[in-house]
Amino acid sequence: MQISHIIKKYDEKTVVNDVSFSLPKGKVTSLIGPNGAGKSTVMSIISRLIAADNGSVVIENKDINKWNSKELSKHLAILTQTNNIQMKLTVEELVAFGRFPHSGGRLNSKDKEMIDKAIDYMELETFRERFIDELSGGQRQRAYIAMVIAQDTEYVLLDEPTNNLDIYHASNLMKIVRRLCDELGKTVILVLHEINYAAFYSDYICAFKDGKIASFGTVEEVITKENLSSIYNVEFEIMQIKGKPLSIYY
């Protein structure tokens, strides 16, 4: 995926300003930065939820705006910050939505196999017949990720997936993200506020400030005292824990 010179304005305010980068295939890339830095807007443009005013996003050598929605949904899946489905659905019914781009609502044996695999992968078998609104926050988030797995796309986009999760469920979710890449070969793009989750579980980090890319590279290249202090305007110290540069800020 290649993002080239994208610009987005709301009225007179430029929220994304000439952003360009490539997403490495089969890797986890996290978008980080302060509130209002433009990272979620970039994610929305990449997933075609909103249109850029200028620039392009290219997937498989084809501009994202030239894909029809059904075909694009076979290549790219997104889980947004708010996923409030206004229907009484079981876990299995929710996960089945992931097969809609493939089946058009008429599930065949291949679709059912993918649904079963996704439920099993996310360890949701005991919740299969439970209604979504009966689940805890962590269980519900796993169900939505199972839906994304069932969709079976190369690119998986997750916008602040750890929002509203406690430490236990958030860390478990990040382990799942890592498995999506390592075990299933997905290219995963996340928006994260928690810098240490980005540092520990990502392969690459794209850091934003004021609508522009402040730093892009491997975790070790981006997570430095100088970079983070400049981006967030607070003091940082970096410690190596299990071979990862984790940050302390104050």
Name every feature range the model reports, one short phrase each.
Residues 47:
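Helix-to-loop junction immediately C-terminal to a conserved catalytic motif
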Residues 32-34:
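The feature captures the beta-strand-to-loop junction immediately N-terminal to the Walker
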Residues 55-63, 72:
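Conserved ABC transporter NBD signature motif
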Residues 96, 109-127, 152:
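Conserved ABC ATPase "signature" region
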Residues 131-135, 139:
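Conserved ABC ATPase signature
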Residues 156-160:
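Catalytic Walker B motif of ABC-type/P-loop ATPase nucleotide-binding domains
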